[in-house]
Amino acid sequence: DLTPAQRFEMKVVSAVLPFRVNQYVIDELIDWANIPADPIFQLTFPQRGMLAPEHYARIAELLENDADKAELDAAVAEVRHALNPHPADQMQMNMPLDADGKRIDGLQHKYRETVLFFPSQGQTCHAYCTFCFRWAQFVGDKDLRIASSEARQLHDYLRDHREVTDLLVTGGDPMVMKTRHLRDYLEPLLRPEFDHIQTI
């Protein structure tokens, strides 16, 4: 059993960073006799050290004092921003533009041969890992989220960029999507016009 202190620490951290675990992990993978040292527990349950001491103290104080939702939300937003949710200006620098100069949502073209695609239907995982650097995708803030539900934009971009050989479907676990969504994104890539795409 988790102690009240451990539960509170998790509450503090999960106010800022996403927390999700599934029954299989809880029942089959965690050695509950070895908490908190169990590696799968460490991998999936929020840990106090995930936040800087000053961030932890600020959120803990608000929770202990039953701060109103608006005050807590504002503090959480400030802490998230301080955590640098999108390093290296990836929301600006790596976002490709269409022929009209408009940003194509849900794509990143960071490397010459590789395009990252963030399908909106795949922006979750069965369990969130504590080391995940894509946490901004899961916190419910659409300003932090990179996502697209436009298969056409993906296909148009790949058709126009023959230097791209690799498509990385990411953001969360794409295998949580319904098959029909995954098919809409990937099946057209089997056509000859996409023969430059070698790895998905």
Task: Give residue ranges: language-model regions.
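Active-site glycine-rich loop that binds ribose-phosphate moieties when present
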Residues: 43, 99, 148-156
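Ferredoxin-like iron-sulfur electron-transfer modules
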Residues: 103-120, 141-143
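Core AdoMet radical
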Residues: 133-150, 161-200
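Glycine-rich, often proline-containing surface loops adjacent to acidic residues and nearby aromatics
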Residues: 111-113, 128, 163-168
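Flexible, acidic/Gly-rich N-terminal and inter-domain linker regions that tether
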Residues: 1-109
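Local cysteine-cluster metal-coordination motifs and their immediate loop/turn environment
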Residues: 118-136
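Conserved, mostly hydrophobic/aromatic
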Residues: 25, 129, 200
